[in-house]
Regions:
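Start-of-helix register in tetratricopeptide repeats
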Residues: 25, 59, 93, 127-131
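Conserved structural position within tetratricopeptide repeats
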Residues: 51-52, 82-86, 120
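Canonical tetratricopeptide repeat
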Residues: 63, 97, 131-135
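Alpha-helical segment of the N-proximal tetratricopeptide repeat
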Residues: 22-53
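Register position in tetratricopeptide repeats
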Residues: 36-37, 70-71, 104-105, 121, ...
Length: 142
């Protein structure tokens, strides 16, 4: 049906928008599908190629870092989050995920600093701030 066709055409854009991007290309869209399937190794490979082709895309670096972190490469992930935030210091996804990394590696003050910045960027709250707040509280309870 035409409805299904339209959905299939726009679904990569909906997935990409979930990660803060409104104009994904094929590599980026493929990486997001891998991430949603928790296939982080495949996502990392695609995002490595993507960031080579689009080195100024903060969101590409963010998802590359996220995939690296999910695979246990915490030091590399930290460098990649820094790269993403150097390109766009207001990248909410990068601030959230970097904050999670800080909390995960026992640096609660840095995690709280990222949360404070997110609260400034979204005074009426946003998913990134709520997710980071929840993650920090979850770590603190352990």
């Amino acid at each position: 049906s035409i409805t299904l066709l339209i959905f299939l055409l726009i679904s990569p854009y909906l997935l990409a928008a979930k990660y803060g991007k409104t104009d994904p290309d094929k590599l980026y869209s493929r990486a997001i599908k891998f991430i949603d399937q928790e296939r982080f190794f495949e996502a990392k490979k695609v995002l490595k190629a993507y960031t080579k082709s689009k080195p100024e895309d903060s969101y590409g670096w963010t998802l590359y870092a996220f995939s690296e972190r999910k695979l246990g490469g915490l030091e590399k992930a930290e460098q990649l989050y820094e790269k993403a935030l150097t390109l766009d210091s207001n990248n909410k996804a990068a601030l959230e995920y970097q904050g999670e990394l800080f909390a995960q590696t026992n640096r609660p003050l840095l995690a709280e600093s990222n949360l404070a910045k997110l609260k400034i960027l979204c005074p009426d709250s946003c998913e990134e701030a709520e997710q980071l707040d929840s993650f920090i509280k979850g770590i603190a309870e352990k």
